[in-house]
């Protein structure tokens, strides 16, 4: 085949990446006039959100203490199955026939499978009037017990009718107070601007008079908190910019992830949200190019987190035996100056043994130089010394 398949694969991959990778960056999608120093604003917001994640336990405890019976009912769930079970009980008790879901494209509804669940319960969607309404709480504030919702005039009208209002929030969405909410709203507004210009922030304080119910969902977020370097990824805004510029995601798509998280943020979180042994490949698929860090609105150090994932996977021995054996042999070669300085013929043989047949089937092993860089450097030094 003389590398024709390989050349075709490379050219198609390059075309795919060029066509799919967005040229947008965070800097050219915002109004720079809103910020005196955009880079500093991103870092500050990142620090605030990551600090809230670090203090999640304190903020949740404070929120629980601040909540009064007059605010309505509040439920805690470790997984979405328990949440849906409680929701089914509520539907049966109240004899609910119609529902309304605000912002149906939200990743949260996809995560808990709300739409498919309501269809199974034989309830019908109603825009004009519904027995129960669902809203995503983008942030919950521990000092006041209020929520932040992105909505429009229709959302406000829905909140004030006589239906049962169900608010759903992940534990990672808790914030200490509203001191830095202005900066968060500016950057979040810019992120949602292209999707829907009519959305604007609403801070809502729940009340039992309005039949308000709050569902707080863990769903393995607390498991991520056990990993100190990776826990700050829970501050993610879910803007999708990192996926837009990721060469792996643009070439392979999101089918490999099979989750609401995809792209670089999935390479960090998925191994800890799911069974880590089944998702080791997502951390190793990353090329560590750094495009995601450049466009992240809150400057998350995604490359460092992915590297920490790989280190943890290696320490726990979660790689298949064949991969571990190859890594061990490669490590021996790369850490030995003598082996690296061997003539190219023997290096080529070793590479053939280390690389599987599937990789060598349609791809040529690059030709090795006769001398290593170290040998050439010493040789050049000797020549210069002799000339003197």
Language model regions located:
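Short, contiguous, pocket-lining structural segments
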Residues: 173, 234-238
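Secondary-structure junction/capping motif
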Residues: 55-58, 78, 113, 177, ...
């Amino acid at each position: 085949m003389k590398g024709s398949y390989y050349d075709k694969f490379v050219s198609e991959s390059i075309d795919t990446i060029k066509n799919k990778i967005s040229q947008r960056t965070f800097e050219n999608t915002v109004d720079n006039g809103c910020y005196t120093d955009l880079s500093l604003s991103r870092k500050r917001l990142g620090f605030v959100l990551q600090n809230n994640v670090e203090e999640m336990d304190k903020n949740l405890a404070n929120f629980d203490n601040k909540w009064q019976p007059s605010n309505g009912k509040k439920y805690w769930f470790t997984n979405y199955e328990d949440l849906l079970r409680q929701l089914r009980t509520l539907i049966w008790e109240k004899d609910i026939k119609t529902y309304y879901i605000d912002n149906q494209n939200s990743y949260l509804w996809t995560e808990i499978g709300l739409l498919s669940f309501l269809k199974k319960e034989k309830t019908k969607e109603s825009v004009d009037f519904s027995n129960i309404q669902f809203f995503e709480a983008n942030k919950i504030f521990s000092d006041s017990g209020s929520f932040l919702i992105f909505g429009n005039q229709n959302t406000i009208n829905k909140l004030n009718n006589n239906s049962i209002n169900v608010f759903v929030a992940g534990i990672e969405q808790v914030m200490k107070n509203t001191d830095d909410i202005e900066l968060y709203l500016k950057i979040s507004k810019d992120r949602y601007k292209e999707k829907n210009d009519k959305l604007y922030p609403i801070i809502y304080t729940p009340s039992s008079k309005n039949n308000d119910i709050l569902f707080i969902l863990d769903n393995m977020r607390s498991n991520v908190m056990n990993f100190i370097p990776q826990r700050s990824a829970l501050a993610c805004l879910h803007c999708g910019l990192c996926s837009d510029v990721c060469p792996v995601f643009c070439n392979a798509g999101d089918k490999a992830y099979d989750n609401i998280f995809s792209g670089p943020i999935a390479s960090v979180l998925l191994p800890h949200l799911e069974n880590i042994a089944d998702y080791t490949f997502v951390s190793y698929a990353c090329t560590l190019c750094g495009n995601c860090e450049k466009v992240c609105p809150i400057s998350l150090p995604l490359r460092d987190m992915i590297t920490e994932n790989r280190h943890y996977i290696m320490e726990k021995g979660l790689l298949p035996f064949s991969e571990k054996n190859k890594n061990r042999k490669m490590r021996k070669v790369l850490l030995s100056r003598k082996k690296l300085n061997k003539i190219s013929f023997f290096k080529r043989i070793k590479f053939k043994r280390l690389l599987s047949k599937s990789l060598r089937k349609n791809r040529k092993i690059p030709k090795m130089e006769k001398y290593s860089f170290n040998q050439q450097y010493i040789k050049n030094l000797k020549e210069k010394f002799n000339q003197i």
